[in-house]
UniProtKB/Swiss-Prot annotation:
Its main location: nucleus. Gene3D superfamilies: Winged helix-like DNA-binding domain superfamily/Winged helix DNA-binding domain. Transcription factor that, with ptaR2 and ptaR3, coregulates the expression of the gene cluster that mediates the biosynthesis of pestheic acid, a diphenyl ether which is a biosynthetic precursor of the unique chloropupukeananes. It comes from Pestalotiopsis fici (strain W106-1 / CGMCC3.15140). This is Pestheic acid cluster transcriptional regulator 1. One of its GO terms (cellular component) is nucleus.
């Protein structure tokens, strides 16, 4: 039997690779193609895991090619199996066979060698995340039999166990960190979403950004667009600062506000006119004359698998801390902004796919879930006093991410009835 010419093999691989990149292949409407895509992606993950476990990628030089047999001997795997894996992965643009019996890196596969964190993420995806996903039906059935509602699926790793394994194993910690960064992470769209607000009507009013990013608060971006409002950047103070107080610094001395950050702000990040403060979570808001309070809900970047925003109790604590301020200043607005599960069709399909994937992964790994927009609206409405309550008066969605902004005001009960 005559062998297939190598140029024909490469041509076939190019056709498949091009088809994979096409949106109709990624999101097929035909049931058979849908199943084929699932099977193909599953095999890609299995092969990536296999290549990683036997450290085969590191055995291939970053430039030039090497005989597949030499790589197989070095890694201690069968030549035939390695050849089949390489030829399959090549259909996705991951490695290539430039000449029959030789293997070389493509830019995609080379990145997994020059930056091992890509491989760390892939291994965690294959060994932990995908395994938990496959056991979702089984775990839900067990949860139901034990008297649960099946929502908390009895995952293999509850949050405590996963945190423990992460802290005890440097390898697991490295893999979890890479997985969170490359697979389930998305870029925050906070600054762009805030820019959609009508800043001109604020004039020289005061704006407070609560729980600002320590390194790059959104206020720095907003001052570039709108120089008139006076900005105050508040970060949660460290335990060493007395509970219930605020420590204020000016822009010229504000480098001290990054007390536990590994990175100090550069001079370019310091803007005249921005005041930096530290506050305790849930302590009374010390800036009482602001027109707008912007509270960021997302957690700081973490090395553990957990929901993207603060816990309900933490959110309620901050809402109550601002209840009096909003009550006594009818012009004041509180903006809650962060990653939330959107209402169906509210954001771009690709962005919704990412956030829905993150939600399911979180549930399968820890039995937790991301918070939905409707849940947060209900939480806000439950914060009240004898005269009125907090209400959501507007919602802003980012079309390209799960970032949502809710505009909140204090409303008197008799006003609502009227």
């Amino acid at each position: 039997m005559s062998s297939v010419p190598i140029d024909s093999v490469q041509a076939a691989q190019q056709v498949v690779s091009t088809k994979i990149k096409d949106k109709s292949w990624i999101m097929p409407t035909d049931p058979a193609e849908f199943l084929q895509q699932i099977a193909y992606q599953s095999q890609l993950l299995a092969c990536l895991h296999w290549l990683g476990e036997f450290q085969i990628l590191a055995c291939v030089p970053l430039s030039g090619s090497v005989p597949i047999k030499d790589v197989a001997d070095l890694a201690g795997v069968p030549v035939s199996q390695l050849a089949h894996v390489i030829r399959f992965m090549a259909t996705a643009g991951f490695m290539k066979e430039p000449r029959r019996g030789e293997v070389a890196h493509t830019p995609q596969s080379a990145a997994f060698v020059t930056d091992p964190s890509f491989l760390d993420a892939g291994i965690f995806l294959a060994q932990v995340s995908a395994r938990s996903a496959r056991k979702m039906a089984q775990n839900s059935a067990i949860s139901t039999l034990m008297g649960g509602d099946g929502a908390n699926n009895g995952s293999d790793f509850d949050n405590g166990e996963l945190l423990k394994s992460t802290s005890e194993s440097p390898r697991v910690q490295r893999e979890v960190t890479a997985y969170l960064h490359y697979v389930v992470n998305e870029v925050s769209d906070t600054a762009n979403l805030l820019a959609q607000l009508d800043w001109r009507k604020l004039g020289s009013s005061s704006v407070v950004e609560i729980r600002a990013d320590r390194i790059y608060p959104a206020s720095l971006v907003l001052t570039e667009l709108h120089s008139t409002p006076r900005f105050t950047v508040q970060t949660f103070q460290e335990d060493s600062v007395e509970q219930g107080t605020a420590v204020t610094t000016t822009a010229t001395t504000s480098s001290s506000f990054i007390s536990k950050s590994s990175e100090e702000p550069s001079p370019k990040r310091i803007k005249p006119g921005i005041t930096y403060q530290k506050r305790s979570l849930g302590s009374p808001q010390v800036v009482t004359d602001a027109t707008m309070y912007v509270m960021r809900l997302e957690r700081p970047h973490s090395t553990s698998v957990q929901r993207s925003i603060l816990d309900e109790g933490q959110i309620v604590s901050e809402l109550r801390a601002h209840l009096g301020v909003l009550k006594h200043n009818s012009n004041a607005t509180l903006i809650l902004i962060g990653p939330l599960l959107p209402e169906a069709g509210a954001i771009d399909a690709k962005a919704e796919m990412v956030v829905r994937f993150r939600d399911l992964s979180l549930n399968q790994l820890t039995s937790e879930r991301e918070m939905e927009v409707g849940e947060l609206v209900d939480i806000i409405g439950d914060v009240q006093d004898e005269s009125g309550c907090l209400v959501v008066v507007n919602k802003l969605y980012s079309r390209t991410s799960s970032t949502v902004a809710l505009e909140v005001r204090y409303e008197l009960y008799n006003y609502r009835k009227g």
